[in-house]
Amino acid sequence: MGKRLGALTKDNTKCMIKVNGVTLIDRLLIQLSSLQLSRVVIVVGYKGDKLREYIGNRYPDLHIQYVYNTVYNKTNNIYSLYLAKEYFVEDDTLLIESDLIFDDALFHKIVDNSYPNLALVAKYETWMDGTMVRLDEDD
């Protein structure tokens, strides 16, 4: 359903796009594998069964659970987050969008951080659209 990516997402989800020969979801799951997490919860919608089949048993060191957003074409990321809410009250949570690329060291910095809550945001650029965060001197 990634409309802006056109043909690249006609038959796949955005996270299955390859960058430098590696799908975004593979890159992310490899990074998460190094963190020794108790579980990874993936909310799937568009082409969700195809993504689940693709991931299969590739990551035996990750306990992967899936939540299905059956109304993905009418909802957004917030609704997907709502669908997975039961998992967030059980454990510490890393909320990650699977169509983004992160430096490997970033995840270790987050997990090893002493703050009880932490949000990472990109510096605003004029080309950006979507949700924005404004910080003041207290943040």
Task: Give residue spans per PLM region.
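Short catalytic helix/loop segments, enriched in acidic residues and glycine
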Residues: 10-27
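Conserved beta-strand scaffold positions in the cores of enzyme catalytic domains, especially
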Residues: 16, 66, 117-119
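Short beta-strand-to-loop acidic/aromatic patch adjacent to the donor-nucleotide binding site
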Residues: 91-101
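Conserved core of the sugar-phosphate nucleotidyltransferase
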Residues: 103-139
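Short amphipathic alpha-helical segments
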Residues: 9-10, 30, 53-56, 106-109
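Short beta-strand/turn micro-motifs composed of small residues
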Residues: 44, 97, 121
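N-terminal nucleotide-binding beta1-loop-alpha1 segment
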Residues: 1-10
